[in-house]
Amino acid sequence: MAKIIAFEEEARRGMERGLNHLADAVKVTLGPKGRNVVLEKKWGAPTITNDGVSIAKEIELEEPFEKIGAELVKEVAKKTDDVAGDGTTTATVLAQALVREGLRNVAAGANPIALKKGIDKAVEAVTAALLEQAKEVETKEEIAATAGISAGDPAIGELIAEALDKVGKEGVITVEESNALGLELELTEGMRFDKGYLSAYFVTDQERQEAVLEDAYILLVESKISSVKDLLPLLEKVIQGGKSLVIIAEDIEGEALATLVVNKLKGTFKSVAVKAPGFGDRRKAMLQDMAILTGGQVISETVGLSLENADLDALGQARKIVVTKDETTIVEGAGDPDQLAGRVAQIRAEIENSDSDYDREKLQERLAKLAGGVAVIKAGAATEVELKERKHRIEDAVRNAKAAVEEGIVAGGGVALIQAGKVAFETLELVGDESTGGNIVKVAIDAPLKQIAINAGLEGGVVAEKVRSLPAGHGLNAATGDYEDLLAAGINDPVKVTRSALQNAASIAGLFLTTEAIVADKPEKASAPAGGGDGDMGGMGF
């Protein structure tokens, strides 16, 4: 395919136009008085949202250089969202301000490499000042306030704070769509996985269609079980002990499954057979998690354990196991707390070292099942469009709340950046074009507060100057128009969100400033309509 090439100012300005198209669409959503953006979908109803990353993802520009600029800024929004769950609009606004100021200086003759170095040093200093300002999140109310601001709804904030309080910061909070209006929180104690009983004959509670086994043994097998001969010695020992048995294996089929069902129906002993969750290595890892949680062992040929030789010592135990047709919950496993802590530490290390988002998500789920618990927030709404938008807002607010617990909070509303900058630039010493790079950051960090003020119908520059003169933590409450102590008023942002937004914006701005040439695909000309006529009815003269 033929390429088009642009150099120097033409290349940079083309990219900047793309950035501006995207940023101008996104920044109208910033702050408590930000507006919504309607996104047309090829299929189904349009989406209405005020989430920066959702808007950015939908924007596809036609002009090649503009498209490249927009794609780079999408990366800022996506990366900030992945890390902190919020701050995508702030990151986009910061990137726009940094690029605008930077390109002005490059056009005036500044050295782009020195500018980038100055920007990086200034961002490092502002980040350090932000972390110094951070206040640890200690109360449920503070978490509720942070999540409530992210979701734009205090009720959602309170529900997320309740969920985090129950499952802990390692716990998993999932968001599901509900048929009922409103919000509902469902908590799961113990480990839950998405596999149910292999036969409805195992059900003990007919009304709820559940198999509930109290104080039961748990047999964990890595392979399939089809022959009853392998299982009989162990079954006899379990029956003598007078306990019920849960078997979790790759599969249980044929005469082995039939024997368990017949014994259950005769009342000889209670049991339930469940397929192990996951596939391949992930299944092995989850079986090992269950073994540590319940104090048992995984019966596997690879470690020299066979089913026919297994003893009661190889079985795990739990106070209660609830199995439905779709899922299994193990409550209060009898595992050794030290071994459990070791396993949790191991999974945490794997999360740190993983490069794949998918693997990280799955490891996080395993960690939650072992260390915390699972909370499900069920969200309902009157229309499908509203439901999708609400679900997305709640998911972002959950990540936002976890970020607040992780690194602490700072004053919200764009105030923390300005006040951290004031502290950072007092001691920062730069020379030449690096100093100009530092000044670019100094100007750009005002942009989020100015945009929040503009969206609230106020004069951005006036508000920024006023906030600069206020005590630390005091700023504009854009919802009311008052200047007050924002942390006391519950207007805060996780420092991780603010920090990530600034760092990611600066990273992309550096790429813009140091770009000297662009090579892009030449747009294809639209082909003429079929039939070669006048484009109406194929030239048929109608």
UniProtKB/Swiss-Prot annotation:
Cell compartment(s), UniProt: Cytoplasm
GO cellular component: cytoplasm
Gene3D superfamilies: GroEL (3.50.7.10), GroEL-like equatorial domain (1.10.560.10), TCP-1-like chaperonin intermediate domain (3.30.260.10)
Residues where ATP binds: T29, L30, G31, P32, D86, G87, T88, T89, T90, G413, N477, A478, A479, D493
Subunit structure and binding partners: Forms a cylinder of 14 subunits composed of two heptameric rings stacked back-to-back. Interacts with the co-chaperonin GroES.
Organism: Beutenbergia cavernae (strain ATCC BAA-8 / DSM 12333 / CCUG 43141 / JCM 11478 / NBRC 16432 / NCIMB 13614 / HKI 0122)
One MF annotation (Gene Ontology) recorded for this entry: unfolded protein binding
Protein name: Chaperonin GroEL
Keywords from the UniProt entry: ATP-binding, Chaperone, Cytoplasm, Isomerase, Nucleotide-binding
Cysteine-cysteine disulfides: none
Broad EC category: isomerase
Catalytic activity, reaction form: ATP + H2O + a folded polypeptide = ADP + phosphate + an unfolded polypeptide
InterPro entries: Chaperonin_Cpn60_CS (IPR018370), Cpn60/GroEL (IPR001844), Cpn60/GroEL/TCP-1 (IPR002423), GroEL-like_apical_dom_sf (IPR027409), GROEL-like_equatorial_sf (IPR027413), TCP-1-like_intermed_sf (IPR027410)
Function as written in the Swiss-Prot or TrEMBL entry: Together with its co-chaperonin GroES, plays an essential role in assisting protein folding. The GroEL-GroES system forms a nano-cage that allows encapsulation of the non-native substrate proteins and provides a physical environment optimized to promote and accelerate protein folding.
The enzyme's E.C. designation: 5.6.1.7
Cited Pfam families: Cpn60_TCP1 (PF00118)
GO biological process, one term: protein refolding
